[in-house]
């Protein structure tokens, strides 16, 4: 196969990535699926991921204008998560990496009872252990370069340590979790002539937005 790939922007993130949302999470999921399929098919003699490095394309209107973002490295040669994933699958040099190094400050609106998020550790070792704030989350088998852990995040600092033999990696994630707060807003300003047509002002249309209380 000549090429496949998906663009990503290290400033955008999602726990539920979707097509063309330009999150590193979608780029990883897209390429992971293609690589898994290619590895299953003996009739393919080779394939290539497009591209190694983000590059300029005048007139392109993605999340970063004039840039093709399908690279495994940013335009200034910083490694994306897909780079570490491919390294874990294909490199013989021992390595370990906790995914999410460009998503260390997270804000969420959620129920207090929901505090578990999945974290991937990329490695070419057989097993890895993940430690969260000093407590081991167990040892997982590495499958296709990746081990997935359910991490019980807390508000504030979350320190993650991944270990496999002499290899280790550390990632600090600052989490700000808040319950949703609703704000009702009128669509029409006070002096809008359309407003005069409504006899009962309490019936004015409104919409709901969900604000994030950062403090």
Predicted regions and their residues:
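Extended substrate-binding grooves/exosites of carbohydrate-active enzymes
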Residues: 1-141, 150-153, 159-165
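A residue-level signal for beta-strand positions that form part of recognition/binding surfaces
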Residues: 95, 182, 204
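Beta-strand-rich structural segments
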Residues: 117-123, 202-215
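Residue-level signal for glycine
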Residues: 134, 169-171, 213-215
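Glycine-centered loop-to-beta-strand initiation motif
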Residues: 145-147
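Terminal or standalone catalytic/regulatory effector modules within metabolic enzymes
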Residues: 158, 174-177, 190-193
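Edge beta-strands of extracellular beta-sandwich domains
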Residues: 166-187
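Compositionally biased low-complexity segments at domain edges in trafficked proteins
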Residues: 186-211
């Amino acid at each position: 196969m000549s090429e496949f790939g998906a663009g990503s922007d290290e400033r955008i993130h999602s726990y539920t990535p979707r097509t063309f949302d330009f999150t590193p999470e979608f780029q990883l999921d897209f390429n992971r699926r293609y690589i898994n399929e290619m590895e299953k098919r003996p009739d393919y003699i080779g394939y290539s991921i497009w591209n190694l490095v983000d590059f300029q394309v005048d007139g392109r209107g993605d999340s970063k204008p004039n840039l093709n973002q399908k690279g495994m490295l940013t335009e200034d040669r910083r490694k994306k998560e897909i780079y570490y994933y491919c390294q874990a699958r294909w490199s013989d040099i021992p390595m370990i990496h906790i995914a999410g190094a460009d998503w260390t400050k997270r804000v969420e609106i959620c129920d207090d009872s929901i505090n578990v998020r999945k974290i991937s550790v990329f490695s070419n070792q057989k097993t890895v252990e993940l430690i969260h704030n000093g407590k081991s989350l167990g040892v997982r088998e590495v499958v296709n370069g990746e081990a997935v852990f359910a991490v019980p995040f807390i508000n504030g600092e979350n320190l993650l340590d991944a270990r496999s033999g002499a290899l280790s990696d550390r990632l600090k994630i600052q989490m700000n979790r808040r319950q949703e707060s609703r704000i009702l807003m009128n669509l029409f300003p006070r002096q809008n002539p359309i407003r005069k047509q409504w006899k009962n002002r309490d019936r004015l249309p409104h919409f709901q937005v969900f604000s994030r209380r950062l403090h």
